[in-house]
Amino acid sequence: METSGGSPRKRHVLIVDDNAELAWFFSEILKLHGYEATVMADAVVALKHLLSHATDAVICDLQMPSLDGDLFFATVERARPELVRRFIFVTGLAEDVRFHKFISTVEAPVLRKPVAVETLLAEVDRAAR
């Protein structure tokens, strides 16, 4: 990927998680590995961002106050279907029936919190290709 000036464009990751500390940690790890990262705690605000910004990967919490990850995904799927394959879900939930059903219907990886750095980087590399 190149910018109009010919230099390589950094891949951009959108992190949607209401856990500010974890989202910041993910962001710092990604920046150390050459990514640009945007953190958004509110999924509704993140939806607006996705409509007008290029994104190479989306890390999304499954359970959030304003809009849960499954509904966020469904909205993105309708508005920007090309991003569906770029999702990575994270969750601290053990087994929630609603989310389990959703997870079984999508082809996005689900990482359990706490997430190993190596696992996070591998999944972001895969999603951002």
Q: What kind of feature is each model-predicted range?
A:
Residues 1-14, 78, 116-129:
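Non-catalytic signal-transmission and effector/linker regions of two-component phosphorelay proteins
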Residues 24-32:
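Charged docking surfaces used in two-component/phosphorelay signaling
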Residues 34-41, 49:
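Short hydrophobic/Thr-rich beta-strand motif most characteristic of the beta2 strand and flanking loop
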Residues 41-45, 68-74:
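Acidic catalytic/metal-coordinating carboxylates
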Residues 61:
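Active-site residues of response regulator receiver
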Residues 64:
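Receiver (REC) domain active-site loop signature in two-component systems and cognate sites
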Residues 90-91:
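Hydrophobic/aromatic residues positioned on beta-strands within the core alpha/beta folds
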Residues 113:
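A Lys-centered signature of the CheY-like receiver
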